[in-house]
């Protein structure tokens, strides 16, 4: 007579084997098993897996996919107790988030009365992906089509924030920005065009601007800054916004 012992099999059927990972994000999954009674020692082995994938002694798989490791990866995990052995076939799709490669400046200056017509551009490291543009928020009448065309006609001066999203169906990226509708400042002072020979020329500059908020900070008031674009060498604008020119070294005539 003899005794025949039937060794229990290792059941891995409860594991989900089609998974998704994202480039540059840690991917972790646990291997579950059923065995009655369970053997004291279980060994896990990766077969044909990516070089930088690891599995520890309790069946935890970890992987940090690189940008060069996009799309589908198929590999196997062997689970054995030295007698029974079961293979689990895995398929992981590595997704790279889409990239908005061309977009307006974070603060886009739009002259009053003009129309915003900007073509956003994108790319995705994955092959055969369909990207979707979406306008998450924005001013009234702003539109964003599926070709990345961002359009708006606005007349209200100041900041108009908006947010767009680009999605590949798995991951998405967002872009927050603002359109600043601007009207140019207007001089309210009248220039002095004649000065007696040898005397000091002074012209008090003043101007107004219908934009009351700074284009660069929506929490700061607007500021008018005067600068001299052209003039005689000794002409300058002082700290009190006075255009000053010492004329004693200049002969009579017209100066621009």
Where are these regions (language model features)?
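C-terminal edge beta-strand
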Residues: 1-7, 86-95, 172-181
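Proline-centered linker/hinge motifs at extracellular inter-domain junctions
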Residues: 8-12, 50-53, 98-100, 105, ...
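A short beta-strand segment in extracellular, disulfide-stabilized domains
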Residues: 26-33, 115-122, 200-207
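Strand-loop-strand motifs at the edges of beta-sheets in extracellular beta-sandwich domains
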Residues: 51-66, 140-154, 233-248
